[in-house]
Swiss-Prot record:
The lineage of its organism: Bacteria, Bacillati, Cyanobacteriota, Cyanophyceae, Nostocales. One of its GO terms (molecular function) is structural molecule activity. Residues 1-21, 118-148 are annotated as: Disordered. The gene is gvpJ. The keyword Nucleotide-binding does not apply. It is found in: Gas vesicle. Its main location: other. Residues 136-148 have a biased composition (Polar residues). The keyword Cell inner membrane does not apply. InterPro entries: Gas-vesicle_GvpA-like, GvpA, GvpA-like_CS. A minor component of the gas vesicle, might be involved in nucleating gas vesicle formation. Gas vesicles (GV) are hollow, gas filled proteinaceous nanostructures. During planktonic growth they allow positioning of the organism at a favorable depth for light or nutrient acquisition. Pfam families: Gas_vesicle (PF00741). This is Gas vesicle protein J. Keywords: Gas vesicle. It comes from Nostoc sp. (strain PCC 7120 / SAG 25.82 / UTEX 2576).
Amino acid sequence: MTTTPIHPTRPQTNSNRVIPTSTQGSTLADILERVLDKGIVIAGDISISIASTELIHIRIRLLISSVDKAREMGINWWENDPYLSSKSQRLVEENQQLQQRLESLETQLRLLTSAAKEETTLTANNPEDLQPMYEVNSQEGDNSQLEA
């Protein structure tokens, strides 16, 4: 009769068991998804003072969330910021058009101003042109009386 030798077995200890944690089986993507879904706020104050005289006090508030969660909370400043939205190109083009219109209007104004100055200079050189209209009309009326 053959017998198989019996080997002593090791008693099981707690070192073989895995301690469950809240991040067990979670990848970085899972953690980010949870944080962005719920949102997280980090707040802090920085104060610099010398001899109980406060020089600088900075309050920092940081909100990390998904775009959808931020919209739910009423935060959507990036939608109206021309540097962060697709409207920026349209605003640049509109700005260029307005600059061109402004330059055109300034050129027209300069031309009109110089023309008005020239006209004033010409009329100042010819005093006959400065006679009031009623004097011219009264002289014409005098001639008609002489003819009759």
